[in-house]
Design a protein with these regions (language model features):
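Structural detector for hydrophobic anchor residues on beta-strands
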Residues: 43-45, 60, 183, 244-245
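Cysteine-nucleophile amide-bond enzymes
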Residues: 5-10, 53, 107, 117-123, ...
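N-terminal targeting leaders that route proteins to membranes or the secretory/organellar pathways
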Residues: 1-20
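C-terminal subregion of chymotrypsin/trypsin-like serine protease catalytic domains
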Residues: 7-11, 23-26, 218-289
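A conserved glycine-rich beta-strand in the N-terminal activation segment of trypsin-fold
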Residues: 40-59, 258
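Short beta->alpha transition motifs characteristic of CBS
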Residues: 63-66, 168, 246-252
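Serine endopeptidase catalytic core focused on the charge-relay Asp
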Residues: 28-31, 43-44, 76-198, 204-205, ...
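Residue-level recognition of beta-strand microenvironments
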Residues: 50-52, 190, 219, 250
Length: 289
């Protein structure tokens, strides 16, 4: 995203709204997705791109139940039509044209029926997180969350009752165009209580259907707390700061605002598995040719 395009778009928005403000980069990172069976739309949700660093491939990250069309716990079909999706439409920002979107349609299954998506190598289908596709055209604006740089993960301290935001599309609603809605709630536990076998934590947030697959971030302006070795320090800053925490996957039940978030460490594992799968297929393709 060029600074010139961003600056001109900001001037346009401020002129139209009469409000002097800015468009947060995190608003640009959440992507509206729609799941289809052939031409029939079944559902909508949220996704985002993730990459290890600025030099690595980026993959689309969303919930497994979004692409399977099935309840993670019961395996029941989620659509009232009794169908499961076989393709997904992703609304990307157009490259070089902020405020315009480009739809990319991807199949979910190979010709042999094997899913295109990659699951967690440790937990498999138990983890409600998948990665899809590593190659994107030059016509889409790629704005990933980075797993292994301080751009999106800088050891900010986030404790119980601290605010966190779920940035997605509740009921398919957007704030404008295909820009997402920020739903903000609170951490409902300590992050250090997660494990490799159960890398899920709870938040207390009024998130709803359509926000499944949303990035969950601790966004701070004016100041933040940071883990520095074995200490927690307070930092005052005029610039906004955030910590990417994981991916939202829905409420624990319909009567509660407690929601599950799969920790960023799961996304790291899946990204590495997706990269390995991509390289293996590239090598096999070269050998066959």
């Amino acid at each position: 995203m060029s600074s010139m395009n961003y600056d001109s778009y900001m001037k346009k928005l401020m002129a139209e709204s009469g409000v002097k403000s800015t468009l947060e980069i995190l608003t640009m990172k959440s992507l509206f997705i729609e799941m289809f069976f052939d031409e029939q739309k079944l559902s909508s949700g949220t996704a985002f791109l993730a990459a290890n660093d600025t030099t690595s491939h980026c993959a689309l990250i969303t919930n497994r139940h979004n692409v399977t069309g099935r309840n993670q716990e019961t395996d029941e079909c989620l659509s009232r039509l009794g169908a499961i999706p076989n393709n997904i439409v992703i609304h990307f920002h157009k490259e070089g044209s902020i405020g315009e979107w480009h739809k990319v349609n991807l199949p979910l299954y190979r010709e042999n029926g094997e899913p295109y998506w990659i699951e967690d190598p440790l937990l498999g289908k138990k983890a409600d997180v998948i990665a899809l596709n590593l190659n994107w055209g030059s016509d889409v604006n790629k704005l990933p969350y980075y797993m292994k740089t301080t751009l999106d993960r800088d050891n900010l301290y986030v404790g119980p009752s601290d605010t966190v935001s779920v940035i997605g599309f509740p009921f398919g609603i957007s704030s404008s165009g295909k820009f997402p809605v920020w739903a903000t709630g609170f951490m409902a536990q300590e992050l250090l209580l997660i494990t490799k076998e159960n890398p899920v934590f709870l938040i207390d947030c009024r998130a709803r259907q359509g926000q499944s697959g949303s990035p969950v971030v601790a966004y701070r302006s004016g100041g933040f707390r940071k883990i520095d070795g074995d200490k927690i320090t307070s930092v005052l800053s005029a610039a906004s700061k955030w910590e990417f925490l994981g991916i939202y996957s829905g409420r624990i039940n319909n009567e509660s605002d407690l929601g599950r978030v799969w920790h960023a460490s799961v996304i790291e594992r899946i990204l590495n598995a997706a990269e390995k799968d991509f390289q293996d297929r590239m090598t096999k393709s070269k050998e066959n040719n």
